[in-house]
Amino acid sequence: MNPFNIISDTGVSAAVYAGLSRAKCTGQYKECRNGGSTFLRNVKFHITDPRNRNLTLNGRKSNIFQMVAETFWVMSGSGNIKEFLEFFLPRAPQYSDDGINWHGAYGPRMYAHNQLQSAIDLLIKDKDTRRAYVMIADPTLDSAPAIEAAYGVGHSPKDVPCNREIHINIIEDKLCMKVIQRSGDMLFGTGSINPFEFTFLQELLSEATGYALGDYQWDVTDAHYYKAFEDQVNDVLRSEQTFWPNDGKPLGTRFTSATKMQEFFAGVVRVWVKQINRLIDLGDAHYAINDLFADYGVLPEGRLRDYAKMVTFYIAAKQGEIEGDFKALLTNIPTNTDLGQAILTSPFRKFGVVLGD
């Protein structure tokens, strides 16, 4: 078995497809706590366009609306799954040790100890620094004594962070980022939400520091898929694939601090919680989020606004507030892009989507 695997491509979809293909051809099978899995050792995934993050793989059941919502939740710094996250991910409580929080939620850990702000400050001060990093792993939370103290003797945690640390460097005046991952599911983690949320973070840091966006890589010690989901892997590999490009549209932020960044995303999530609880309707949510964009200097025509609009409409549609073709939804997103195709192929079918040309 090859002890090292390097997979490099333009975007997430192409890289994930290549990873699944290689695992299917050369991966090793083993039994583990979640059933049998086929895995590759020491996989270095690398993409040259982090904006090409929107997953579009035929045969793969993926909901772009859920990915966007979870990423906003991560960036809000929350670990609480009630009210908001479980609306999008009904299975979220299955991974909670107390039924309320995810023990390994990335948001609280990334913002802890002022890590993100420290990284931003270092990068602005010295573009040659090698000290810009963010730790997700935390022995004070994840060691056996810490787990026992938090949840009781003999407790086996349901959620220990797979992603452990983030390295950020400036290479040729571009902000490049690498994430170290101990273990990654190529269908539901390392091949799905993880590259989406971390390239999203990378772009936020790029805009906060003023550097152009560089490449992204994620290094996975054990990249695998489970036997229970092998049919879905086979469906992906048998299907004809088009790896759609990204249109290059930036998020459109320039947060002056990590605190402002967290405040903004927490504010947007609070609006959505009100919408989910039917305290406000679609129109009120739309205008409240517009106000937040204005207050924090986020461009109303940037990709972040497209993402926010998607979630706002998704909530309204799930609650039956809108039906049929909704022509106002993201008319500036071409169908021949990764995001346009991610929306069109989403399994969520409660409303039609009409995009731009």
From Swiss-Prot:
Q: Which Gene3D superfamilies match?
A: Thymidylate synthase/dCMP hydroxymethylase domain
Could you name the domain of life of the organism this protein comes from? Answer: Viruses
Q: Which UniProt keywords apply?
A: Host-virus interaction, Inhibition of host innate immune response by virus, Methyltransferase, Restriction-modification system evasion by virus, Transferase, Viral immunoevasion
The record's annotation in InterPro entries points to:
Thymidate_synth/dCMP_Mease_dom, Thymidate_synth/dCMP_Mease_sf
Q: Mind telling me which Pfam families this protein's record contains? A: Thymidylat_synt (PF00303)
Which EC class is this protein assigned? transferase
Report which reactions are catalysed by this protein: dUMP + (6R)-5,10-methylene-5,6,7,8-tetrahydrofolate + H2O = 5-hydroxymethyl-dUMP + (6S)-5,6,7,8-tetrahydrofolate
What induces this one? Hydroxymethylase appears immediately after infection.
UniProt-listed Enzyme Commission number(s): 2.1.2.-
- Which sequence ranges form a coiled-coil region, renumbered to this chain? none
- What are the BP-aspect GO terms? methylation; symbiont-mediated evasion of host restriction-modification system; symbiont-mediated suppression of host innate immune response
Question: Which GO terms label this protein's molecular function in UniProt?
Answer: methyltransferase activity
Biological function: Catalyzes formation of 5-hydroxymethyldeoxyuridylate (5HMdUMP) as a step in the pathway that replaces dTMP by thymidine hypermodifications in the viral genome. As a final result of the pathway of hypermodification, 5-Nalpha-putrescinylthymidine (Nalpha-PutT) substitutes for about 50% of thymidines in the viral DNA. These modifications probably prevent degradation of viral genome by the host restriction-modification antiviral defense system.
Family of this protein:
Belongs to the thymidylate synthase family.
**Protein name listed in UniProt:** Deoxyuridylate hydroxymethyltransferase
Instruction: Supply the source organism for this entry.
Output: Delftia phage PhiW-14 (Deftia acidovorans bacteriophage phiW-14)
